[in-house]
């Protein structure tokens, strides 16, 4: 039944709606300005500036919501607005969005503001946008001189090489390319290596998104090749070959490669989008299995992604019948973890009490999760979605899970009719725990898992992240075979840690003792002591020492810390370094150009 009023008679309803939209427009203007600034920082190789910009943008949304709520309280006494007026506010807001270019994001902003003002009882479609009201189909920016969402190129008229060069130069990056002709030739060879010779159909064309995707030290060109009935995705990473010159680093031509660079374990891109829904639609056309929620999140619109994810969860619950259960595996000391087997995510709650030896607090753990959210995740740390006041149907909760919730997190649950309301939780992608992957894997899988684990930890410490508890159970294996860290309660900055060698035992008694014979400070780490916990399985030990014999050498850890203290930021690649042109086609690189730099970076 529709409870909306037939007449919009409230002036305050229109004023509140307009105020909320004005505040959203301010938020989105700041969001786009960050992407424009990213281009300048990339061109100047200001990597610390890019990191700062990415961190600040993550908290910008909540800042704008808070400002809007404060303004509504000051101007309209929002908490005391008559509840009959709120449906009118929503209708006025819908009217204001009919020609808007980011309506779905504006609806989410409206929800964020209203949920700070209204009681949970009003979180329904009469008052907030439980479902979208404005279609995002076929929105395009038709303002004069505006960039289209994507540009179409037709190689048939000028040849593929010339078209590829025009695609690159149209982005008007300021530093010159070291050798653009060489890089285009590498792309041509890579296309031939991947697809062989293919006949050009009458509709042969290339579509390229009009904005670059910035992250870390890389800017990505993203597009698709249309040939007959085939749609071939591609991404071209642009990097600084050396100071003052650019190079096309490789071309990614497989969907699984693109899915990895847009994965939940990477930090969000900085990309300028006037019509975000059009970008998301384009990206879904080249990664059709990827949920819209994940794509919105990966392009920096994490609140929209979070909103869509929750709608996906509710939709799944209405079309499934299995029950939430305690997550299989080793139970954690700090987090209670449960899952819905038919839904590929886990739900994590901070326990009310932690047994020894854990010495932490709920606030400290939440700070750790926020640290990860704001840090460069490098494809090695799982992103988390944080929710409050989540109502789950009691009938869908396994009895053992309910007992566990009542035992471990009584302060975070509340019964409300037929629902259990969870006051705070985190949601992450479900992965195969690395300890189970190694325990049940073939020899080849064990070697892959061990190599990936060592690479993951080494990349994390290079990025100033010390995982703390490095047992295999705290890492997971993604659908694409990447090893990702997901247990953050003991995480620290490496620069805050003291890397130490184990002092030699003073006597036989020390050597036989099961306890340290040396003092251990709160931030001391001893890499030599990790071996007994990681190398117990002979099969794991063999592969670990073959690929990462230096892992237990304190010098490896100290060298990373020293580089960080000097302000150095290492190179990270969201794709296999072996795909880089300088390594894949070394014969095309003359001595003294980027080839040598590339070999060193990939070493």
UniProtKB/Swiss-Prot annotation:
One of its GO terms (biological process) is glyoxylate cycle. It catalyses: L-seryl-[isocitrate dehydrogenase] + ATP = O-phospho-L-seryl-[isocitrate dehydrogenase] + ADP + H(+). The keyword Cytoplasm applies. ATP binds at residues 327-333, 348. It holds the Pfam family AceK_kinase. One of its GO terms (molecular function) is ATP binding. Its EC number is 2.7.11.5, 3.1.3.-. InterPro entries: AceK_kinase, AceK_regulatory, Isocitrate_DH_AceK. It comes from the Bacteria. Keywords: ATP-binding, Cytoplasm, Glyoxylate bypass, Hydrolase, Kinase, Nucleotide-binding, Protein phosphatase, Serine/threonine-protein kinase, Transferase, Tricarboxylic acid cycle. The active site is at 383. It is found in: Cytoplasm. GO terms for cellular component: cytoplasm. Belongs to the AceK family. Bifunctional enzyme which can phosphorylate or dephosphorylate isocitrate dehydrogenase (IDH) on a specific serine residue. This is a regulatory mechanism which enables bacteria to bypass the Krebs cycle via the glyoxylate shunt in response to the source of carbon. When bacteria are grown on glucose, IDH is fully active and unphosphorylated, but when grown on acetate or ethanol, the activity of IDH declines drastically concomitant with its phosphorylation. PANTHER family: ISOCITRATE DEHYDROGENASE KINASE_PHOSPHATASE, PTHR39559. This is Isocitrate dehydrogenase kinase/phosphatase. It comes from Burkholderia thailandensis (strain ATCC 700388 / DSM 13276 / CCUG 48851 / CIP 106301 / E264). The gene is aceK.
């Amino acid at each position: 039944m529709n409870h909306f009023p037939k007449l919009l008679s409230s002036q305050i309803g229109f004023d509140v709606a307009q105020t909320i939209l004005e505040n959203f427009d301010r938020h989105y203007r700041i969001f786009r300005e960050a992407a424009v600034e990213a281009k300048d920082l990339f061109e100047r190789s200001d990597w610390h500036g890019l990191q700062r910009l990415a961190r600040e943008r993550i908290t910008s949304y909540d800042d704008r919501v808070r400002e809007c709520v404060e303004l509504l309280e000051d101007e309209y006494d929002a908490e005391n607005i008559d509840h009959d007026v709120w449906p009118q506010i929503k209708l006025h807001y819908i009217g204001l969005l009919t020609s808007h270019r980011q309506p779905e994001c504006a609806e989410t902003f409206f929800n964020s503001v209203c949920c700070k003002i209204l009681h949970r009882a009003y979180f329904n479609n009469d008052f907030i946008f439980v479902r979208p009201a404005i279609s995002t189909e076929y929105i395009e920016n038709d303002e004069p001189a505006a960039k289209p969402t994507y540009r179409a190129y037709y190689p048939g008229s000028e040849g593929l090489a010339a078209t590829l060069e025009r695609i690159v130069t149209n982005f008007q990056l300021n530093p010159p390319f070291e050798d653009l002709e060489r890089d285009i030739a590498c792309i041509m060879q890579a296309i031939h290596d991947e697809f062989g010779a293919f006949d050009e159909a009458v509709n042969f064309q290339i579509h390229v998104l009009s904005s670059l995707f910035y992250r870390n030290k890389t800017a990505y060109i993203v597009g698709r090749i249309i040939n007959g009935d085939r749609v071939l995705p591609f991404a071209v990473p642009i990097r600084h070959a050396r100071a003052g010159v650019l190079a096309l680093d490789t071309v990614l031509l497989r969907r699984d490669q693109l899915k990895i660079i847009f994965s939940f374990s990477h930090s969000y891109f900085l990309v300028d989008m006037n019509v975000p829904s059009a970008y998301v639609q384009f990206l879904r056309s080249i990664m059709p299995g990827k949920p819209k929620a994940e794509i919105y999140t990966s392009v920096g619109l994490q609140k929209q992604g979070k909103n869509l994810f929750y709608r996906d969860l509710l939709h799944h619950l209405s079309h499934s019948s299995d029950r939430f259960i305690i997550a299989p595996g080793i139970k954690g000391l700090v987090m209670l973890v449960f899952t819905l087997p038919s839904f590929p995510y886990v739900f994590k709650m901070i326990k009310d009490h932690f047994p020894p030896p854990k010495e932490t607090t709920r606030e400290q753990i939440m700070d750790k999760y926020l640290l990860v959210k704001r840090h460069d995740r490098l494809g090695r740390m799982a992103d988390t979605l944080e929710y409050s006041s989540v109502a789950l149907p009691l009938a869908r909760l396994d009895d053992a899970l309910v007992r566990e919730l009542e035992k471990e997190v009584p302060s975070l649950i509340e019964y409300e009719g037929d629902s259990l309301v969870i006051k705070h939780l985190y949601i992450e992608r479900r992965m195969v725990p690395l300890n189970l992957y190694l325990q049940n894997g073939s020899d080849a899988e064990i070697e892959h898992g061990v190599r990936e684990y060592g690479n993951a930890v080494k990349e994390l410490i290079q990025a100033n992240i010390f995982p703390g508890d490095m047992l295999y159970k705290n890492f997971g294996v993604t659908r694409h075979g990447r090893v990702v860290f997901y247990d953050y309660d003991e995480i620290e900055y490496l620069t805050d840690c003291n890397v130490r060698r184990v002092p030699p035992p003073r006597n036989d008694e020390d050597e036989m003792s099961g306890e340290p014979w040396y003092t251990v400070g709160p931030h001391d780490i001893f890499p030599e002591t990790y071996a007994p916990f990681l190398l117990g399985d002979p099969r794991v030990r063999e592969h670990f020492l073959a690929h990462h014999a230096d892992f237990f050498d304190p010098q490896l850890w100290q060298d990373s810390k020293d580089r960080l203290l000097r302000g150095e930021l290492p190179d990270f690649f969201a794709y296999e370094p072996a795909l880089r042109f300088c390594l894949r086609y070394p014969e095309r690189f003359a001595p003294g150009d980027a080839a040598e730099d590339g070999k060193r970076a990939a070493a």
